[in-house]
A protein has these predicted regions:
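Secreted/periplasmic carbohydrate-active enzymes, especially glycoside hydrolases
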Residues: 1-218, 223-233
């Protein structure tokens, strides 16, 4: 956060990447070995400087159940005193996998902190569940209005329930078998994992063609585009 630290004019940002063995985990630690890309390089993907109003949405998380969704929204504001509050409005729209708008819900809230968490309930009457055969994706759009400023963010999600019963895993009340492969961050041609969603879509399509339904990323976390591709491929 560079708020109040930048003066008018041209600036240069410098990143220092330190790959020294600071943790002393020895060579047997998979996530810290020279065999995989997690240890080789510094920063991949996107680096950017964003301007946002003080009143904006910090993050959105969606929790699903068999009745609908609960949204966890983190809002930011210019409120820094417990004796000061701002009135704000949260508007939630949900779009179905077929592109139909399911309806709008409006919530009036009190903002009493510079960063606060609120939960909002949105019921869905007819649910198109997500699974490996039907990777249905909904879109939740949240609009935050506070102190004359407006911020809008969207997130895609799949409706599913997961539970266990007699040592069996149930997805949407149906037993599933986890059949997977492993990804150890080994990409020798580039020296880093792909940051293009189309590459991940192709990878998951190939993996799925062998009858598999999950990938375990061993000792590292893939980029956002990998998760988005996996959601869409089931």
């Amino acid at each position: 956060n560079l708020t109040g630290k930048i003066t008018p004019g041209e600036h240069t940002f410098t990143l220092k990447i330190d790959n020294r063995n600071l943790l002393k985990l020895d060579t047997m630690a998979s996530g810290y070995s020279v065999d995989t890309q997690g240890y080789w390089n510094g920063v991949i993907g996107r680096i950017e400087l964003q301007y946002e109003e003080k009143e904006h949405i910090d993050s959105i998380q969606v929790y699903t159940d068999d009745k609908g969704i609960t949204l966890k929204v983190v809002e930011t504001s210019d409120v820094h005193s417990p004796f000061k509050t701002e009135n704000a409005t949260i508007t939630v729209n949900v779009t179905s996998p077929k592109g139909d708008l399911l309806g709008e819900k409006i919530f009036e809230i009190k903002v009493f902190n510079s960063k606060q968490v609120d939960y909002f309930r949105y019921d869905i009457s007819k649910i198109d569940y997500w699974d490996e055969f039907n990777p249905n994706l909904y879109t939740a759009t949240v609009k935050y209005e506070c102190n004359g400023h407006t911020d809008i963010k969207s997130v895609k999600f799949g409706m599913r329930t997961i539970k266990t019963e007699n040592k069996k895993i149930l997805l949407n009340n149906r037993q599933i078998s986890l059949r997977g492969t492993i990804d150890c961050a080994i990409y020798p041609l580039t020296g880093y994992p792909p940051m293009d969603i189309e590459v991940w879509r192709k990878n998951f399509k190939t993996i799925k063609s062998y009858g598999l339904n999950h990938v375990r990323f061993h000792a590292w976390c893939p980029p956002d585009c990998a998760f988005n591709a996996a959601d869409g491929k089931g």
